[in-house]
Amino acid sequence: MEQIKAMGGKKGIVGINEAIAPDYAMITEVLDVDQSPMAKENDPKLKALDNYNTELLWEVYQEPRLKSGSALKELNSASDALILQYYEQPDTLEAAFGHNISRKDWEKIAHVKDTYQDVLFTAPIVAANVAHPLIQYMYDELRSPDRKFTFLVGHDSNLSSVATALGVEEYELPNAIEKKTPIGSKIVVEKFLGADGKEYADINIVYQSVDQLRNMQLLDLDNPPMIYPLTLKGLEKNADGLYLMEDLNARFEQALRDYENIK
């Protein structure tokens, strides 16, 4: 819990919420919360939107989750729904319920969901625990001499926890309103055999741009997805931007040890 509180600085959990208060305000503006029947009736449930004392729930063998009744919990659901509406509704005015908002404003809306993911899945001790099954599977697959291609399907929470467990440096994706794990994004690890006989690895996050998503564009060689290189803390890339495979394997092994250390 202390690692999560540290994300908000001296104010801890409250500090996390205060940092995204403008993003909360954007969501409530788009939803016309102040004009809603609940607001007119002074429904006490709306007090949750001003509650910055986010509470986390922990259960053995379960992923962490947030207790209902806080701004982050309730407005994350709204953020998620609005993001999908923005992707699916061609008319941006209609997507925002008649509000003329900018791409930057949509980034604010999506930032609430990004923060929610960070709180739940990117504290180092949480990531090491939650990501462990995937880290083990990926490690085994990457070391399999006969494996040519492996495709794993998961959730944005899986991407967040795996990236943290592997020590990926902070990043913000271009041409995306979701800056870390856009819908449909994938972490792609490629292996190469160098002319020197050594194995190398490239690690990127691959995703569709906002326009590709909103316009439902087919992806091909003439219209490829976005590819953003991920950087692993403490590891050096060569001139081609690749890591030594033995260094990447060592990073996976460290992530596996991190899990063992918290058992």
Segment roles from a protein language model:
Residues 1-150, 154-263:
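Signature for phosphate-centric chemistry
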